[in-house]
Structures are given as structure tokens and as C-alpha cells.
């Protein structure tokens, strides 16, 4: 016997009522899975900043982070070499609104470099760039930035005996700070390319956005990044 139309309609409504919460849960789960790498990078960036603030060799960094117009953070900058060398890592860029003092949502980038000449070894580093000038901010927002060419970079003062009064090359657009372990004596970022990862920003914010959309126009938000921005404010307030 075939059920009559009213019974069929009620059955369909019941099925839809039961399915909608399940579909909503599945959609949320898939969204979390889709941006898992991006969320991990934001979390790692917060940890890197926390590591820098706790490092006794980063006195100057702690004393001057409030002067930065922007921060570029790479939690894992890997370098390896056997005659020829290559280095790279993913990072985030955030900038400060000069009027309100509020920090932007993170834009996603990759940083990479190649080197030549005899070299051997491997190294993992944490990198933070203090962006000191508007030129540095604007160049990064273009999404394809080369350190030393599109903006000047200098090595920031590092060491337990370095006081906040020590003056580095403040004419540079960016100051680089590196915490490294490995067989290399040091890490040079001169010539490294910083390229926006628009597909990562899309995954994190759920729609296509450029670095300018994120950092300047502030068209998107992701509550997950609140912990990173809170860590930046904590760093500034502790001064």
C-alpha cells in the first residue's frame, strides 16, 4: 500500500529536521579540517612570539616591539645545504592601525631563499621581522617582496648584554631577529623573498582576500587569531 501524500510530506519534513543539524555539524567539521594548517601556523606564530619575549637574548626586541608598524613571524625557517643551499618557511604578517592601535588579522606568506658557494649543514630557526617603516608595510602588502631589494633589512641587536638604548640601523625598513639551532653559524635573510599565500588566506577566512584586504581594509575576521593579537598586546603592555 502506497502512503498518502500528507504522510509522505510529514516524513520528508521529519527527515530534513533530523538531517539539518547533522549537515551543519559536518560542514563545520570540514571547515575546521580545511583550515587546519593555517590555524596551526597562527598558533605556532603566537608561540614563537612568546619564545622571543621570554628569551634573555631578546632584550632589545622586547623593549622596541611597540615601535613596530608590523610584525612578520616565521615559526619554522628551515635551511639546508650541501654545496648549494635553500631555505624556506611559512609565516604570517600583521600590522598596526596607527589611529586605533589595533592589530590586524594575519595575512599568510611564505619566505624562501637560495644561496651559493661552499656550505654544509642544516638549521631550524624562528624568525621575527619588525617592520619599522610604512614603506616596509606597503611593500609587504604587494605580496611579492624581496628583502634588500624592495625594502632594506638590518640585523636586530641580540644578546643578554644588549640594552634597550643600543641603536641599530634604524633607517632600515625591517629589523630581523632569529633564534636558531644547527650547524650554521648564523642566518642571513638578505635576498629572501616574501610571497603571499592567497590560497591559505582563502582557507582561513572562507573567501578570496589579498593581504591589503586583510591588513588594511580589514574585510575579514577569524576569532581563532585573537590569541596571537592578544600576545602582541601583552608584549607591548609589559614594556
Predicted regions and their residues:
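Generic cytosolic/nucleocytoplasmic N-terminal low-complexity/intrinsically disordered segments
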Residues: 14-16, 49
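Hydrophobic alpha-helical segments, especially transmembrane helices
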Residues: 10-14, 76
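Intrinsically disordered, low-complexity regions
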Residues: 5-6, 28, 55, 207
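Bacterial N-terminal signal peptides
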Residues: 16-27
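N-terminal secretory signal peptides that target proteins for export/translocation
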Residues: 1-11
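Small-residue-enriched, tightly packed secondary-structure blocks
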Residues: 34-239
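Boundary at the C-terminal end of the N-terminal hydrophobic targeting segment
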Residues: 29-33
Amino acid at each position: 500500500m502506497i502512503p498518502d501524500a500528507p504522510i509522505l510530506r510529514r516524513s520528508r519534513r521529519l527527515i530534513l529536521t533530523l538531517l539539518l543539524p547533522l549537515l551543519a555539524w559536518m560542514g563545520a567539521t570540514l571547515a575546521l579540517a580545511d583550515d587546519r594548517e593555517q590555524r596551526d601556523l597562527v598558533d605556532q606564530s603566537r608561540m614563537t612570539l612568546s619564545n622571543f619575549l621570554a628569551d634573555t637574548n631578546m632584550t632589545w626586541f622586547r623593549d622596541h616591539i611597540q615601535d613596530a608598524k608590523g610584525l612578520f613571524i616565521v615559526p619554522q625557517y628551515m635551511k639546508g645545504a650541501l654545496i648549494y643551499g635553500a631555505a624556506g618557511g611559512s609565516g604570517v604578517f600583521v600590522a598596526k592601525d596607527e589611529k586605533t592601535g589595533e592589530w590586524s588579522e594575519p595575512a599568510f606568506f611564505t619566505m624562501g631563499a637560495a644561496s651559493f658557494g661552499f656550505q654544509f649543514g642544516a638549521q631550524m630557526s624562528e624568525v621575527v621581522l619588525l617592520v619599522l617603516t610604512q614603506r616596509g608595510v606597503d611593500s609587504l602588502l604587494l605580496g611579492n617582496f624581496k628583502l634588500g631589494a624592495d625594502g632594506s633589512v638590518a640585523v636586530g641587536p641580540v644578546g643578554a648584554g644588549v640594552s634597550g638604548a643600543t641603536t641599530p640601523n634604524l633607517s632600515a625598513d625591517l629589523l630581523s631577529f632569529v633564534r636558531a639551532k644547527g650547524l650554521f653559524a648564523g642566518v642571513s635573510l638578505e635576498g629572501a623573498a616574501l610571497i603571499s599565500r592567497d590560497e591559505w588566506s582563502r582557507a582561513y577566512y572562507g573567501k578570496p582576500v589579498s593581504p591589503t584586504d586583510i591588513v588594511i581594509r580589514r574585510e575579514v575576521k577569524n576569532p581563532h587569531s585573537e590569541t596571537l593579537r592578544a600576545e602582541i598586546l601583552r608584549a607591548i603592555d609589559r614594556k
